[in-house]
A protein has these predicted regions:
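Juxtamembrane helix-loop junctions of ABC transporter transmembrane domains
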Residues: 2-5, 28-29, 36-49, 74-121, ...
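Alpha-helical segments in transporter systems
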Residues: 21-42, 71, 88-90, 136-149, ...
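Membrane-integrated ABC transporters
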Residues: 1-37, 52-67, 85-89, 93, ...
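Transmembrane helix-loop-helix hairpins at lipid-water interfaces of multipass membrane proteins
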Residues: 23-81, 161-166, 278-282
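Transmembrane helices of ABC transporter permease
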Residues: 22-34, 74, 141-195, 269-280
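ABC-type nucleotide-binding domain
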Residues: 60, 265, 331, 337-584
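An intracellular "coupling" helix at the cytosolic face of ABC transporter transmembrane type-1 domains
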Residues: 18-21, 113-114, 130-139, 143, ...
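Helix-loop-helix
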Residues: 55, 159-173, 247-317, 322-323
């Protein structure tokens, strides 16, 4: 994946090109700032030469008054131009970062589950927030400073040549030394900056992991272990940050200031040697000394901003790396726009997550509209993998999956998502209200349809007992509601969409027995007229399934209804007897 510094800068400039007129305005204000800043020493030179060295008669008070008006006029103009330049660059910066965040978020929505299964959530959050903010800092601070420094350096150098080119030539040997210093600094600091950003991402990962799993952390008394791990990562981040500071402290202002002092010494020596023969005026000497300072100041600013520039470039590279990820969810041909009935057939399907070891081996089954089938088996037998393939979270390796006799790949993504209702073991609720969580993206659903869906799964009474009813606020992940309540709301969300196919992935595994009994009738009503595939942990919940498939190590080893499997006396019966014994 191409993330070189030149490539990163080129891509960032393409974002800036979207706001080319606003950027051009910012550059114009920056150029005006440089001109006004360069004009101030010229005004001082005029004042000194006409007041101190001039033999012309005239009122000193009038000359001083004219100088003050000119000087403060230039100063106020420079301040105003600087303000407008920074303001415009900030607008461009904020717009660019908004676009980058939107683009990376859009790409995250397209990425398949394989990406999320392999990437820590904290790392993703770090790139979308911290790294994009570093890019914002680059445009609002670094880029504007670099442009301003370049223009000021160029205008100052031209002005110095126009004043006295002999003097200016004595300054030129310092430029290659400065260039070499900058190159050496970049070489030494690049790796340190990259590792500092990586350790910051690791901190976000560990923090996110700790917060999301706090119940488990406290239940298993893992606070000290996690604290030690966090302290180690934090110490590594501190080490790289301090090493970066060491390099910055050596190569930034101290080195540039030393070169500036040497330049002063050279110029003053030249003035001393040539004073009698050159005819230098006091105003020229003052202006030239000011321009030497003004010539070095942009170089000092550039070196000071290199640390931020490198951080921003590396951060932008990390952002573009994620933006360029193309391990999307499986592609759909999209020629079929609607599922008519919901008949499903798996025909000799095999699948591997890593491309080496099959987790599903030659899976074949069929379920008609209105029928219910269930998959049971020990952990790791492949039950959830079947759901992952059918939901098109992953692409199967061999075989074929058909819906209504058509290849599942021929349906549009919208048709599949609209016609399939998925209820997971861990129900997920979004920040919002009860009604918005039931409605989800189906904006066309009326409030009455929301209430009907809630009543259908017997959760309406609970909702209406809440303060605000359907407008009751839901916190992130619905943490203030019980697992059973969240699951009932997930059922209401599913039924509100009126899917033709129902997928229940251990949907009652985390519900207490009393709540389970309460929703069994609702589940039966939900399944009527719909093709239903259920993954079950509690065998008691799928005894009325038309067919039950027993999986072991990715293969179907038994199939039949409950009575047939009990009579068979195989794995299913052993599982059933074990659960029945635990219930006694």
């Amino acid at each position: 994946m191409k993330t070189s510094e030149a490539h990163v800068m080129k891509r960032l400039l393409t974002y800036m090109w979207r706001y080319k007129w606003l950027t051009a305005l910012a550059l114009a204000f920056t150029f005006l700032t440089s001109l006004l800043l360069t004009a101030i020493p010229l005004a001082a030179r005029w004042y000194i030469d006409h007041l101190v060295d001039s033999t012309e008669t005239g009122s000193p008070v009038l000359t001083a008054f004219q100088f003050l008006i000119l000087y403060y006029g230039l100063f106020i103009g420079r301040v105003l131009a600087t303000y407008l330049s920074q303001l415009t660059f900030a607008r461009v910066s904020n717009s660019i970062v908004r676009d980058i965040r939107l683009d990376i978020f859009k790409n995250l929505q397209r990425l398949g589950m394989s990406f999320y299964d392999q990437t820590a959530a904290g790392s993703i959050v770090s790139r979308v927030t911290n790294d994009t903010q570093a890019v914002a800092d680059m445009f609002s601070t670094v880029f504007s400073s670099l442009v301003s420094s370049f223009l000021l350096f160029l205008v100052t150098l031209v002005t110095m040549f126009s004043l006295d080119w002999h003097l200016t030539i004595w300054i030129l040997p310092f430029l290659p030394i400065i260039w070499f210093s900058i190159r050496l600094y970049r070489k030494l600091s690049n790796r340190l900056v990259k590792m500092t950003r990586q350790k910051l991402s690791d901190i976000n990962v560990k923090l996110s992991e700790s917060i999301e799993g706090m119940r488990i952390v406290q239940a298993f008394r893992q606070e000290k272990r996690l604290t030690d791990e966090f302290e180690q990562i934090n110490a590594e981040h501190l080490d790289y940050a301090n090493r970066s500071v060491d390099v910055n402290s050596l190569f930034l202002r101290p080195a540039m200031t030393l070169l500036q002092v040497l330049a002063y010494a050279v110029i003053l020596t030249f003035f001393g040697l040539k004073w009698q023969s050159s005819g230098f005026t006091a105003g020229l000497i003052y202006a030239f000394i000011q321009y030497v300072s003004q010539l070095f100041q942009p170089l000092i600013d550039v070196t000071q901003n290199f640390a931020t520039l490198q951080t921003s470039t590396i951060s932008a590279g990390r952002v573009f790396e994620m933006m360029d990820r193309d391990d999307y969810e499986p592609k759909q041909a999209g020629s079929l726009k609607e599922i008519e009935r919901g008949d499903i057939r798996f025909d000799h399907v095999s699948f591997s997550y890593d491309g080496k070891r099959d987790v599903l081996k030659d899976i074949s089954f069929e379920v008609k509209n209105g029928q219910t089938i269930a998959f049971v088996g020990h952990t790791g037998s492949g039950k959830s993998s079947i759901i992952n393939l059918f939901m098109r979270f992953y692409e199967f390796d061999r075989g074929q999956v058909l819906i209504d006799g058509q290849d599942i790949k021929d349906y549009s993504q919208e048709a599949l998502r609209k016609s399939i209702g998925l209820v997971l073991q861990e129900p997920f609720l979004y920040h919002g209200t009860i009604a918005s969580n039931i409605r989800m993206y189906h904006k066309e659903l009326t409030d009455e349809e929301i209430r009907q869906a809630a009543a259908f799964v017997d959760v309406a009474d609970f909702i209406e007992s809440l303060p605000g009813g359907y407008d009751h606020p839901v916190t992130e992940r619905g943490s203030t509601l019980s697992t059973g309540q969240r699951q009932l709301l997930a059922f209401a969300r599913t039924i509100a969409a009126q899917p033709k196919i129902l997928i229940l992935d251990e949907a009652t595994a985390n519900i207490d027995q009393e709540t389970e009994e309460m929703i069994q009738n609702s589940l039966k009503k939900m399944r009527q007229g719909r093709t239903t595939i259920a993954i079950a942990h509690r065998l008691s919940t799928i005894q009325d399934a038309d067919c039950i498939y027993v999986l072991d190590k990715g293969k179907i080893i038994e199939s039949g209804n409950h009575d047939q499997l009990i009579a068979l006396g195989g794995t299913y019966k052993k599982m059933y007897d074990l659960q029945a014994g635990m219930m006694k």
